[in-house]
Amino acid sequence: EELPIGSIVYKNQYLKGSYNENCYYVRIEKKRKDDNYWLKPKGLYGTILHEGFYDTIHESVCKLLDFIEKEGYQVIGDMYEYEIHNHFTSQDIYKYLIQISIPVEKR
């Protein structure tokens, strides 16, 4: 079962090679009536699945950034890390699965 939690790393931070989380989020199924939450912006995202422990996440981020550049896109926002499997769902740290998404636009 997937977990409804994730983290956000600010653009100015991950572009400098720092991948520490700036804030966390919880996924919700449908829009709420109050304004006490923030929605992930709609749009085109470059995405990669990172399998492994957190200390190797930079390898996947670098692959994704290289791919985005190679395909003629540029990053335009913060990076989202959505934890599909982590210490709550896997006893093997090398089986952690994190979806990394970065909003992009064509150059």
What do the PLM-derived regions correspond to, one by one?
Residues 1-107:
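A solvent-exposed interaction/effector surface
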